[in-house]
Amino acid sequence: MAKKNKKKEPLQVVVPKFDTLKLIEPLTKSQEKAFAAFRKNSHLCLSGCAGTGKTFLAMYLAFEEIMSGKSKAEKIVIVRSIVPTRDIGFLPGDRAEKESTYLYPYIAICAELFGDPMAWQKLVAKKQIEFLTTSFVRGITLRDSIVIIDEMRSEEHTSELQSRFGISYAVFCLK
């Protein structure tokens, strides 16, 4: 039996959906004000009850800015205290394992914004997003970054972070 020579079809290139940021519209008057204020000036302090979308809004506006191609910022840096607000006891593991507990909201937001459950990991690999804790921010200068200070509860941590900002940054403070 002779083998038929089949033409090989060229490989199809799949463009990852993750590079496309979902369009988000403000849902409330307060969110409209936040959108407008950020677009006029690069610094915002957002406060509100739990579940009002502060972190989601900040991350969306930060990604929108970075992906516009007009921003001097190269990445988003999320800074958060990992001191538990309720005593949950000792968390075993190394630094990365301890911090991973606090990453879940950001992973979920990235998955929703990009329509890809692996968006956070891809953004980290591309060095477009970074997570730091207030415990390890000393000695670091946050250059060319949009900084999101999440769960800002301590005045001490806030003043400590202010000395870490470099050139061409935007800051979101979320209470």
Residue ranges and their predicted role:
Residues 50:
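The conserved Walker
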Residues 155-175:
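Single conserved hydrophobic/aromatic residue that forms the stacking wall/gate
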Residues 53:
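Conserved glycine(s) of the Walker
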Residues 47, 56-124:
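Conserved P-loop
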Residues 1-13:
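Interdomain "pre-motor" coupling segment immediately N-terminal to P-loop NTPase/helicase cores
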Residues 23-40:
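N-terminal pre-P-loop "Q-motif" helix
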Residues 127-148, 153:
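Conserved RecA-like ASCE ATPase "motif II neighborhood" in helicase/translocase motors
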Residues 40-45, 144:
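Pre-Walker A (Motif I) flank of P-loop NTPase domains
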